[in-house]
Amino acid sequence: MADVVTMKQLLEAGVHFGHQTRRWNPKMAPYIFTQRNGIYIIDLQKTIKMLDDAYNFMKAVAEDGGVFLFVGTKKQAQDSIAEEATRAGQYYVNQRWLGGTLTNWTTIQSRVRRLKQLKEMSEDGTFDVLPKKEVALLTKEMDKLERFLGGIEDMPRIPDVLFVVDPKKEKIAVHEANILGIPVVAMVDTNTDPDPIDVVIPSNDDAIRAIRLIAGAMADAIIEGKQGQDDEETLEVDFKENADGSEEIVSAEENPED
């Protein structure tokens, strides 16, 4: 099987550039190739292998109908996280992570229901008959909920996997996933502790192109896995239909009409 991404793609996206040597986590030492001008250089041979592992893991979960949550709230990640999660038919948080998003899912669901209620009110004409001041307050509430919860508005349940850009910044999300036993796949830079991460992808987590490349690969894995699931379901339906047809033939042979 060919690698998910090529060495050339990783280099062009700047995936190999880590943080300054004075800002490092010693636990990332196994993934560092060298240092240059005070910057750690990530070992891209290891990145390629671990990215392949992450791809296969995401694909396998998708084949089983898994739900994925992409998390990246830093400015460089926001667009890629939203676009790639949406492309894969999954969910995202790209603004501030609300504490309890996973560990207090019931409360989050109530806020999502409120968001849907406000959207319905804005679309069915309710806002047209309310006082302007009240409409302004409701609109402000709706916009705030949309900003923080819009990416998980249709998420049917707690996700099976988190994909995270910069787990150091998203430590609350990672901690909640760890508490619930949800596997975390993450882009981990040289300044970050990899221990809370189940599937580490050693990578620059600050460059927009690097984030887009890795997030895109994860979305591709989900899409491929879902396609495999669809193919299996089609085969199962075909098999059942053929089996039903065979039973009818056997029944007809055993009970021929007089």
Curated annotation (Swiss-Prot):
Residues 244-258 have a biased composition (Acidic residues). Keywords: Ribonucleoprotein, Ribosomal protein. GO terms for molecular function: structural constituent of ribosome. CDD domains: RPS2. It comes from the Bacteria. InterPro entries: Ribosomal_uS2 (IPR001865), Ribosomal_uS2_bac/mit/plastid (IPR005706), Ribosomal_uS2_CS (IPR018130), Ribosomal_uS2_flav_dom_sf (IPR023591). Residues 226-258 are annotated as: Disordered. Pfam families: Ribosomal_S2. One of its GO terms (cellular component) is cytosolic small ribosomal subunit. GO terms for biological process: translation. NCBIfam families: rpsB_bact. Belongs to the universal ribosomal protein uS2 family. HAMAP family: Ribosomal_uS2_B. This is Small ribosomal subunit protein uS2. It comes from Lactobacillus acidophilus (strain ATCC 700396 / NCK56 / N2 / NCFM). The lineage of its organism: Bacteria, Bacillati, Bacillota, Bacilli, Lactobacillales.
